[in-house]
């Protein structure tokens, strides 16, 4: 082995250690991730050829090694104690008074405050700057040796940086899993059909206690330091906060929210600030930790039983509690989604009394295996809707019963559907369901549907709230006199609305189909249906097999269409609309052997049209057999360009696509 290989190995190790600190501690990377990965691969290659050169501080150990049969035990030289808790300002005041009373002649001036991370406490022992041991807290006296696993956590330096560190230094802190990493871990587990973790704390603990460190290496774990234990060979600062800064200078990350304050009132303000920002933080916390900053006063205060007298955890209101699931009700949302809602024995959680929690959908009920009567764990975080996160199955009563999804909508009685591959169950009575009424009516009168001037969202909401309309057909039964009872609706405005409704009765089949709000039937699909079947009766009677023959209609959309027209209540509204006078020009069938002018052509509209509205031009093109798209590509056959055409025209010219004018379109329409 040459000296150059050994020198390169040391260079790579030093560089990787340096850049890990820049990335994980200082949040200020100097090189791209790809360059870091390249150096790591080079290091792994050298060590693979020369395994005798692998040292305990090698960055290569972050990928994990051979599985252990069990964890060995570690006795803590300085006990790892837990903290007493405060749950309100009065208890915090009591902590401060007790501490102040014990140090007569000294004034406690400053406190060091930090978020209380919801993870796993660990001890890191460095000798001569190299990480030689990592252990869990265990019972405070004895923990488990998790050195191999901790070495895989990128945020923890295998070798200290800078200078001035003690020859033996024990750093204590919290291993945790950031929220984003937790979500991604569970998402991947669901895709693979594997068990998911209940919360980030369980995920962090489970990941850190793997006998196979390669599994730990694959988990998104991080670390923040919060104190020291053993210190030999150097003197640290006499301030808890300044010790944090020393530790950080040696390459160990500290929580960026850590702050030194000058009074108990500032401690309380810090607590409120962190509580307010809790949900926005990248990691889970369950309170704040408050420590006397002066180390000399810490030493005078000492410890009592299992906890220091100089520190306390000011806990947030609990985000999880246990209660009984008494019943399940099914609510229908504005789009027809049916959501199971757990009716709970009221419980105080997350700062409020909770009596309802979402169960999301049938898949979630199946995953939880929850039943009515179960003892369940409820979680409420910030403004998030409370949810059932787990079931205590060993407490299940004999009277517990299965939760069954309804076959009919609990609001309107229409059939419900659940498309294969979708989690949501929906009501099919979009035109009649009270829960969906406002959204259905707003869609019906929208510009791309019946296009009724004067019937904006606020008018629709008033009409529904006053129970003046139930279905779209009821709109055409309104008189100007009736409409004047609405807010900001004078006689003239009311007359204009009635006239607009009358005008909208003459429409087109594509617009009418679109106005019905059939799931996933947009403008293009409605146009394709009209062009293929030519009339409404044929569409209503079409089978799924026939519908799939239509351009751009697949199995799912075909199912939505047959389900919609298969619901008698929807059919009744359609017939009522026709009875109110809605009509459209007949779509002529093409003559035998004669193709439509733009049959099979893909076209794009761009620019300002002087004689046609954009929707009108689009409908005309579709009636001429064209497929209208929104962007120019190699598949585009014709670009119809109006005035002030911009980038689409330039791209069409570049691709050599045929370009026509608005007048060309008008000529085709004659």
UniProtKB/Swiss-Prot annotation:
Record keywords, A-Z: DNA damage, DNA repair, DNA replication, Ligase, Magnesium, Manganese, Metal-binding, NAD, Zinc
UniProt binding sites for NAD(+): 33-37, 82-83, 114, 137, 174, 291, 315
UniProt binding sites for Zn(2+): 409, 412, 427, 433
Functional description taken from the UniProt entry: DNA ligase that catalyzes the formation of phosphodiester linkages between 5'-phosphoryl and 3'-hydroxyl groups in double-stranded DNA using NAD as a coenzyme and as the energy source for the reaction. It is essential for DNA replication and repair of damaged DNA.
Name this protein carries in UniProt: DNA ligase
UniProt keyword GTP-binding, yes or no: no
Keyword Disulfide bond in record: no
Top-tier EC class: ligase
Domain of life: Bacteria
EC number: 6.5.1.2
GO molecular function, one term: metal ion binding
Similarity remark: Belongs to the NAD-dependent DNA ligase family. LigA subfamily.
Active site: 116 (n6-amp-lysine intermediate)
Cofactors demanded by this protein: Mg(2+); Mn(2+)
Catalytic activity annotation: NAD(+) + (deoxyribonucleotide)n-3'-hydroxyl + 5'-phospho-(deoxyribonucleotide)m = (deoxyribonucleotide)n+m + AMP + beta-nicotinamide D-nucleotide
GO-annotated biological processes: DNA repair; DNA replication
A GO cellular-component term linked to this record: cytosol
């Amino acid at each position: 082995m040459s000296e150059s290989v050994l020198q390169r190995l040391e260079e790579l190790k030093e560089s990787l250690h340096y850049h890990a600190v820049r990335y994980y501690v200082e949040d200020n990377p100097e090189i791209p991730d790809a360059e870091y990965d390249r150096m790591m691969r080079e290091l792994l290659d050298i060590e693979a050829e020369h395994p005798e050169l692998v040292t305990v501080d090698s960055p290569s150990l972050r990928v994990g090694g051979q599985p252990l049969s069990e964890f060995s035990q570690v006795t803590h030289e300085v006990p790892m104690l837990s903290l007493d808790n405060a749950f309100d300002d009065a208890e915090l005041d009591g902590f401060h008074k007790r501490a102040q009373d014990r140090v007569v002649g000294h004034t406690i001036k400053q406190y060091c405050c930090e978020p209380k991370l919801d993870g796993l406490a660990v001890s890191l022992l460095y000798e001569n700057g190299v990480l030689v041991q990592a252990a869990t807290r265990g019972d405070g006296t004895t923990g488990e040796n998790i050195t191999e696993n901790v070495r895989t956590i990128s945020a923890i330096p295998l070798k200290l940086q800078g200078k001035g560190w003690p020859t033996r230094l024990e750093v204590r802190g919290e291993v945790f899993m950031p929220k984003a990493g937790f979500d991604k871990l569970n998402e991947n587990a669901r895709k693979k059909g594997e068990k998911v973790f209940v919360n980030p704390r369980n995920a962090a603990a489970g990941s850190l206690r793997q006998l196979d460190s390669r599994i730990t290496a694959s988990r998104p774990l991080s670390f923040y330091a919060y104190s020291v234990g053993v210190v030999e060979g150097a003197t640290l600062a006499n301030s808890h906060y300044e010790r944090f800064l020393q530790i950080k200078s040696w390459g160990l990350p500290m929580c960026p929210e850590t702050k030194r304050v000058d009074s108990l009132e500032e401690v309380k303000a810090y607590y409120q600030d962190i509580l307010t920002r809790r949900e926005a933080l990248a990691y889970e916390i369950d309170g704040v930790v408050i420590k006397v900053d002066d180390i000399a006063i810490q030493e005078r205060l000492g410890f009592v039983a299992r906890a220091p007298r100089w520190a306390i955890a000011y806990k947030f209101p609990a985000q999880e509690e246990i209660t009984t699931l008494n019943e399940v009700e099914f609510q229908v949302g504005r789009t027809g989604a049916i959501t199971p809602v757990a009716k709970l024995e009221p419980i105080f959680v997350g700062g409020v009394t909770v009596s309802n929690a979402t169960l999301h959908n049938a898949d979630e009920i199946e995953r939880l295996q929850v039943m009515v009567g179960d003892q369940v764990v409820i979680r409420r975080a910030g403004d998030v809707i409370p949810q059932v996160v787990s079931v205590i199955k060993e407490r299940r009563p004999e009277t517990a019963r299965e939760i069954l999804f309804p076959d009919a909508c609990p609001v309107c009685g229409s059939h419900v559907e659940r498309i294969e591959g979708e989690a949501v169950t929906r009501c099919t009575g979009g035109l009649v369901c009270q829960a969906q009424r406002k959204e259905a009516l707003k869609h019906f009168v929208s510009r791309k549907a019946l296009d009724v001037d004067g019937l904006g969202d606020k008018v629709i909401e008033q009409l529904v709230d006053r129970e003046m309309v139930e279905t779209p057909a009821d709109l055409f039964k309104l008189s100007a006199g009736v409409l004047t009872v609405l807010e900001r609706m004078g006689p003239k405005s009311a007359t204009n609305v009635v006239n607009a409704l009358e005008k909208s009765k003459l429409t087109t089949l594509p617009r009418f189909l679109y106005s019905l709000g059939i799931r996933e039937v947009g403008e293009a699909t409605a146009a394709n249906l009209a062009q293929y079947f030519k009339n409404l009766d044929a569409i209503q009677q079409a089978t799924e097999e026939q519908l799939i023959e239509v351009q751009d209609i697949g199995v799912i959309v075909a199912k939505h269409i047959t389900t919609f027209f298969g619901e008698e209540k929807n059919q009744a509204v359609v017939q009522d609309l026709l009875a109110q006078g809605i009509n459209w020009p007949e779509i002529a069938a093409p003559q035998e052997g004669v193709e439509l002018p733009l049959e099979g052509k893909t076209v794009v509209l761009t620019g300002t049209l002087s004689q046609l509205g954009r929707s009108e031009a689009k409908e005309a093109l579709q009636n001429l057999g064209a497929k209208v798209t929104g962007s120019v590509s190699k598949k585009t056959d014709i670009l119809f360009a109006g005035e002030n055409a911009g980038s689409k025209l330039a791209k069409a010219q570049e691709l050599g696509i045929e370009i026509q004018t608005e007048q060309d379109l008008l000529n085709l329409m004659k």
